[in-house]
Amino acid sequence: MFFFITFVEFFDFIVNDRYANFTKRGIDFFFSGDKRVDLKDLMNYLYESGIKTLMLEGGSTLNFSMIKEGLIDEIRICVAPFVVGGKDSHTLFDGEGFDTMDEGVRLELFDSFKLGDDLILQYKVLNK
């Protein structure tokens, strides 16, 4: 089991002895970055720990950070038969974005299938 914290949060663990209690239970800690986790370091750490596949569920800001760093190999999109959202809704990738088609990330559809009423589209990321 893994637990990720930023360096600033670490001091709470030292003061409260929670860090030692977690490590006694076999929970590994990953320390990286100053205010944010260095995602490339994290992916290397997970790979070296034997984790070869990761499902990303952190939200649109994390999605953008990961794709910007070239850390996403595959994207699965679920098209569901209903409409939600609005002008302030998050998109699949929130962040500074890519201004031109050349800067953007190219995808290749390699599979699609129905799952109940939903349609699942599987894309390979081409230019990581």
Model regions: which residues?
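Enzymes that bind and transform nitrogen-containing heteroaromatic metabolites
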Residues: 1-128
